């Protein structure tokens, strides 16, 4: 079936009142970026719907991209027909023949923005219903919860017919909730946290700590590839690489083993906050889940959060590990996340870290190191890269990956 357009229905935008136009404008920009590889498209955002005219572009490929754009409740591929009922009948029958299996139930549902058209909504429903009953007597008309709905939109320029409704990604358009930094470790949890942040309309930047020679180039490439996995939802994400070797070595030399992880996480948070403030980010997201590891007990979180007043948001905080894994598989980050390249959270990890560290002790041990100097040197070495969904960082690592797996 050659579709003419895709009709997009908004998600939570319907609740946004006076901000509705700003949300629609942001969604229009996000959709335009997501579909930039299809130059013949015409995108027309309206108050209650968005219409994407295909102009010969492949509908399946366009819909696959569209399904990853947050802020969309659902969408329907549609066929434009001249406002001639004989032609509408013919296309409606063709559409039902191609999409409606024998014996299913259906109803006709008409919306009319062109009130000058000869038939009103009820008359249109009856006209098409009678025609289809005559041509497809195997179909059963059912007004409540039918198997299929033939949707009809009567607009000024044409009549649009559709039988498919495809679920969108939901959520809010990315960027409508502001911008934040995400602490990306390379494990399973933080990419899922990033996905949830994007879904709530937050434009995220990835902050990744890199400690050569203790962490490898493969570990860095893995973190970049995880970022690329999330970019289809937003178009591009900035990846901020923070050198952390000197800080880790200094902490290992001067801080008791039980507090290594706590002080290390405090420095990570200090650096993330500094970067966030420089770049206008309003909050910090991470992949912490309460009680999952020693640094994620409530006592540990309190001792670590002590260094910042910036909001710390933990989207997966109350999820079980199996729930996080299921979401990682759904967004296609799980297989990457479990590749066994050490990151800076695992090197120097003590065998028995404090699970209930005291904030005053953490402050005391942190005072033994030159926090300001270490941070200045780390921030001076920060590298920032814009990552897009088409970027590939793991290709050169295939032989290494094959050996590991």
Curated annotation (Swiss-Prot):
All residue ranges annotated as the THUMP domain in the record: 60-165
GO molecular function: ATP binding; CCA tRNA nucleotidyltransferase activity; tRNA binding; tRNA-uracil-4 sulfurtransferase activity
PROSITE patterns reported in the protein's UniProt record: THUMP
Compartments, record wording: Cytoplasm
RNA-binding found in the keyword field: yes
InterPro entries noted in UniProt: Rossmann-like_a/b/a_fold, ThiI_AANH, ThiI_fer, ThiI_N, THUMP_dom, THUMP_ThiI, tRNA_STrfase, tRNA_sulfurtransferase_ThiI
Catalytic activity, EC: 2.8.1.4
Annotated Gene3D superfamilies: 3.30.2130.30, HUPs
Record pathway: Cofactor biosynthesis; thiamine diphosphate biosynthesis
One cellular component (GO) term of this entry: cytosol
GO biological process, one term: thiamine biosynthetic process
Function: Catalyzes the ATP-dependent transfer of a sulfur to tRNA to produce 4-thiouridine in position 8 of tRNAs, which functions as a near-UV photosensor. Also catalyzes the transfer of sulfur to the sulfur carrier protein ThiS, forming ThiS-thiocarboxylate. This is a step in the synthesis of thiazole, in the thiamine biosynthesis pathway. The sulfur is donated as persulfide by IscS.
Family: Belongs to the ThiI family.
Protein name, entry field: Probable tRNA sulfurtransferase
Organism: Lacticaseibacillus casei (strain BL23) (Lactobacillus casei)
């Amino acid at each position: 079936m050659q579709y003419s357009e895709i009709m997009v229905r908004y998600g939570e935008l319907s609740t946004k009142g006076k901000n509705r136009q700003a949300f629609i404008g942001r969604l229009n920009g996000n959709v335009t970026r997501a579909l930039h590889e299809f130059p013949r498209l015409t995108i027309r955002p309206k108050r209650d719907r968005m219409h994407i005219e295909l102009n010969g572009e492949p509908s399946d490929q366009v819909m696959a991209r569209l399904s990853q754009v947050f802020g969309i409740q659902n969408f329907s591929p549609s066929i434009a027909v001249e406002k001639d009922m004989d032609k509408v009948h013919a296309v409606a029958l063709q559409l039902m023949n191609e999409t409606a299996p024998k014996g299913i139930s259906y109803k006709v549902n008409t919306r009319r923005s062109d009130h000058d058209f000869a038939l009103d909504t009820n008359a249109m429903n009856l006209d098409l219903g009678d025609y289809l009953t005559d041509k497809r007597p195997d179909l059963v008309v059912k007004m409540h919860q039918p198997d299929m709905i033939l949707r009809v939109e009567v607009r000024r320029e044409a009549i649009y017919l559709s039988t498919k409704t495809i679920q969108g990604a939901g959520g809010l358009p990315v960027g409508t909730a502001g911008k934040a930094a995400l602490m990306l470790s390379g494990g399973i949890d933080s990419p899922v946290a990033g996905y949830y942040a994007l879904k709530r309309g937050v434009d995220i930047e990835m902050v990744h700590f890199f400690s050569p020679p203790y962490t490898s180039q493969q570990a860095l490439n893995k973190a970049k590839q995880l970022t690329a996995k999330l970019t289809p939802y937003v178009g591009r994400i900035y990846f901020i690489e923070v050198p952390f070797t000197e800080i880790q070595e200094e902490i290992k030399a001067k801080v008791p083993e039980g507090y290594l992880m706590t002080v290390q996480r405090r420095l990570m948070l200090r650096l993330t906050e500094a970067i966030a403030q420089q770049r206008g980010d309003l909050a910090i997201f991470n992949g912490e889940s309460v009680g999952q590891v020693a640094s994620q007990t409530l006592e540990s979180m309190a001792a670590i959060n002590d260094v910042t007043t910036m909001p710390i948001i933990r989207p997966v905080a109350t999820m079980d590990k199996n729930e996080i894994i299921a979401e990682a598989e759904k967004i296609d980050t799980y297989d990457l996340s479990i590749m066994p390249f050490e990151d800076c959270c695992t090197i120097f990890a003590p065998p028995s870290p404090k699970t209930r560290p005291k904030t005053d002790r953490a402050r005391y041990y942190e005072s033994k190191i030159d926090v300001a100097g270490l941070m200045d040197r780390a921030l001076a070495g920060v590298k920032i890269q814009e990552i897009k969904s088409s970027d590939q960082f793991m290709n050169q690592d295939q032989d290494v990956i094959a050996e590991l797996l």
